[in-house]
Regions:
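Membrane-interface micro-motifs in multi-pass membrane enzymes
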Residues: 1-6, 13, 30-39, 125-134
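Hydrophobic, membrane-inserted alpha-helices
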Residues: 2-4, 20-28, 134-141
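Membrane-interface transmembrane helices that cradle and orient dolichyl/undecaprenyl
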Residues: 5-20, 53
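Membrane-interface alpha helices of multi-pass inner-membrane proteins
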Residues: 8, 19-33, 70-73
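Hydrophobic alpha-helical transmembrane segments
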Residues: 18-23, 36-40, 61-69, 152-160
Length: 173
Protein backbone atom coordinates (compact mmCIF):
# COMPACT_ATOMS: atom_id res chain seq x y z
CA UNK A 1 0.00 0.00 0.00
CA UNK A 2 2.96 2.35 0.41
CA UNK A 3 3.13 3.21 -3.33
CA UNK A 4 -0.59 4.06 -3.31
CA UNK A 5 -0.15 6.18 -0.19
CA UNK A 6 2.72 8.10 -1.80
CA UNK A 7 0.79 8.52 -5.06
CA UNK A 8 -2.15 9.81 -3.02
CA UNK A 9 0.16 12.17 -1.13
CA UNK A 10 1.50 13.55 -4.41
CA UNK A 11 -2.06 14.06 -5.65
CA UNK A 12 -2.93 15.79 -2.38
CA UNK A 13 0.00 18.19 -2.69
CA UNK A 14 -0.10 18.80 -6.46
CA UNK A 15 -3.83 18.63 -7.22
CA UNK A 16 -5.58 18.98 -3.86
CA UNK A 17 -7.24 15.56 -4.26
CA UNK A 18 -7.29 13.66 -0.97
CA UNK A 19 -9.29 10.47 -1.53
CA UNK A 20 -6.57 8.01 -2.48
CA UNK A 21 -4.19 9.24 0.23
CA UNK A 22 -6.74 9.07 3.03
CA UNK A 23 -8.24 5.70 2.10
CA UNK A 24 -4.89 4.00 1.33
CA UNK A 25 -3.37 5.26 4.60
CA UNK A 26 -6.42 4.12 6.58
CA UNK A 27 -6.29 0.65 5.01
CA UNK A 28 -2.55 0.45 5.68
CA UNK A 29 -2.97 1.38 9.33
CA UNK A 30 -5.89 -1.01 9.74
CA UNK A 31 -4.22 -3.99 8.08
CA UNK A 32 -0.78 -3.66 9.67
CA UNK A 33 -0.48 -0.92 12.25
CA UNK A 34 3.11 -1.82 13.18
CA UNK A 35 4.64 -1.29 9.74
CA UNK A 36 2.29 1.65 9.23
CA UNK A 37 4.15 3.50 11.97
CA UNK A 38 7.21 3.39 9.72
CA UNK A 39 5.11 4.28 6.68
CA UNK A 40 3.66 7.30 8.50
CA UNK A 41 7.13 8.50 9.49
CA UNK A 42 8.27 8.20 5.87
CA UNK A 43 5.10 9.95 4.65
CA UNK A 44 5.87 12.94 6.89
CA UNK A 45 9.46 13.08 5.60
CA UNK A 46 8.30 12.77 1.99
CA UNK A 47 5.66 15.46 2.57
CA UNK A 48 8.43 17.84 3.69
CA UNK A 49 10.34 17.02 0.49
CA UNK A 50 7.21 17.71 -1.57
CA UNK A 51 6.70 21.03 0.22
CA UNK A 52 10.25 22.04 -0.62
CA UNK A 53 10.14 20.96 -4.26
CA UNK A 54 6.58 21.74 -5.38
CA UNK A 55 6.20 25.46 -4.47
CA UNK A 56 2.75 25.02 -2.96
CA UNK A 57 1.06 27.16 -0.34
CA UNK A 58 1.29 26.14 3.27
CA UNK A 59 -2.50 25.69 3.27
CA UNK A 60 -1.75 22.20 2.00
CA UNK A 61 -0.17 21.45 5.41
CA UNK A 62 -3.62 21.74 6.99
CA UNK A 63 -5.07 19.32 4.44
CA UNK A 64 -2.21 16.89 5.05
CA UNK A 65 -2.75 16.98 8.82
CA UNK A 66 -6.54 16.75 8.47
CA UNK A 67 -6.57 13.76 6.13
CA UNK A 68 -3.81 11.98 8.03
CA UNK A 69 -5.82 12.30 11.25
CA UNK A 70 -8.95 11.21 9.39
CA UNK A 71 -7.12 8.09 8.13
CA UNK A 72 -5.99 7.31 11.67
CA UNK A 73 -9.54 7.89 12.88
CA UNK A 74 -10.93 5.43 10.34
CA UNK A 75 -8.54 2.80 11.69
CA UNK A 76 -9.16 3.74 15.34
CA UNK A 77 -11.47 0.77 15.83
CA UNK A 78 -8.27 -1.28 15.78
CA UNK A 79 -5.79 1.30 17.08
CA UNK A 80 -7.46 2.19 20.39
CA UNK A 81 -7.54 -1.40 21.75
CA UNK A 82 -3.99 -2.01 20.49
CA UNK A 83 -2.64 1.12 22.20
CA UNK A 84 -4.34 0.10 25.44
CA UNK A 85 -2.83 -3.38 25.19
CA UNK A 86 0.66 -2.07 24.40
CA UNK A 87 0.57 0.31 27.36
CA UNK A 88 0.13 -2.73 29.62
CA UNK A 89 3.43 -4.26 28.42
CA UNK A 90 7.09 -3.28 28.74
CA UNK A 91 6.89 -1.58 25.35
CA UNK A 92 4.53 1.02 26.80
CA UNK A 93 7.42 2.87 28.49
CA UNK A 94 10.23 3.09 25.93
CA UNK A 95 13.63 4.40 26.95
CA UNK A 96 14.73 7.04 24.45
CA UNK A 97 18.51 7.13 24.01
CA UNK A 98 20.27 10.05 25.66
CA UNK A 99 23.55 9.78 23.72
CA UNK A 100 24.09 9.47 20.00
CA UNK A 101 25.56 6.08 19.14
CA UNK A 102 26.33 4.53 15.76
CA UNK A 103 25.68 0.82 15.32
CA UNK A 104 28.08 0.37 12.39
CA UNK A 105 30.01 2.37 9.81
CA UNK A 106 28.49 3.76 6.64
CA UNK A 107 30.69 1.49 4.51
CA UNK A 108 29.47 -1.58 6.40
CA UNK A 109 25.90 -0.44 5.84
CA UNK A 110 26.48 0.12 2.13
CA UNK A 111 28.03 -3.36 1.88
CA UNK A 112 24.63 -4.76 2.94
CA UNK A 113 23.40 -3.92 -0.57
CA UNK A 114 25.70 -6.46 -2.20
CA UNK A 115 24.83 -10.01 -3.18
CA UNK A 116 25.43 -13.01 -0.89
CA UNK A 117 24.95 -11.04 2.33
CA UNK A 118 23.42 -13.14 5.07
CA UNK A 119 20.00 -12.15 6.35
CA UNK A 120 20.18 -10.49 9.76
CA UNK A 121 18.05 -12.30 12.32
CA UNK A 122 19.69 -11.17 15.54
CA UNK A 123 19.66 -8.00 17.57
CA UNK A 124 22.80 -6.47 16.06
CA UNK A 125 20.70 -3.75 14.36
CA UNK A 126 21.90 -4.61 10.87
CA UNK A 127 19.28 -3.53 8.31
CA UNK A 128 18.19 -6.01 5.67
CA UNK A 129 18.68 -3.95 2.51
CA UNK A 130 18.11 -5.62 -0.84
CA UNK A 131 18.03 -2.86 -3.44
CA UNK A 132 21.30 -3.97 -4.98
CA UNK A 133 24.41 -2.37 -6.36
CA UNK A 134 22.57 -0.90 -9.37
CA UNK A 135 21.17 1.81 -7.10
CA UNK A 136 24.67 3.03 -6.33
CA UNK A 137 25.63 2.90 -9.99
CA UNK A 138 22.56 4.94 -10.96
CA UNK A 139 22.84 7.44 -8.10
CA UNK A 140 25.37 9.66 -9.93
CA UNK A 141 23.16 9.53 -13.04
CA UNK A 142 20.25 10.89 -10.99
CA UNK A 143 22.40 13.46 -9.20
CA UNK A 144 23.81 14.82 -12.48
CA UNK A 145 20.56 14.71 -14.49
CA UNK A 146 19.92 18.28 -15.66
CA UNK A 147 16.30 17.48 -16.62
CA UNK A 148 15.40 17.23 -12.91
CA UNK A 149 15.43 20.57 -11.07
CA UNK A 150 18.38 21.00 -8.70
CA UNK A 151 16.10 21.63 -5.70
CA UNK A 152 14.25 18.35 -6.31
CA UNK A 153 17.46 16.36 -6.77
CA UNK A 154 18.95 17.80 -3.60
CA UNK A 155 15.78 17.20 -1.54
CA UNK A 156 15.40 13.60 -2.74
CA UNK A 157 19.08 12.79 -2.19
CA UNK A 158 18.93 14.39 1.26
CA UNK A 159 15.91 12.22 2.11
CA UNK A 160 17.74 9.09 0.91
CA UNK A 161 20.83 10.05 2.92
CA UNK A 162 18.72 10.69 6.01
CA UNK A 163 17.08 7.28 5.64
CA UNK A 164 20.48 5.57 5.35
CA UNK A 165 21.70 7.48 8.40
CA UNK A 166 18.61 6.49 10.37
CA UNK A 167 19.43 2.80 9.91
CA UNK A 168 22.72 3.13 11.75
CA UNK A 169 22.13 5.54 14.65
CA UNK A 170 20.26 4.84 17.84
CA UNK A 171 18.44 8.18 18.09
CA UNK A 172 16.92 7.92 14.61
CA UNK A 173 16.32 4.15 14.76
Amino acid sequence: LAPLILLGLERLVKEGRCGLYCVALAISIYTNYYISIMVCIFVVLYFVVLLITEKRSFRIVGNFVLYSILAGGMASVLLVPEVCAILQTNFGDPDFPTQLKSYFSVLDELARHCMCVTTERGLEHWPNLYCGVAVFLLLPVYALNQAIPMKKRFANLALAGFMLLSFSTNVLD
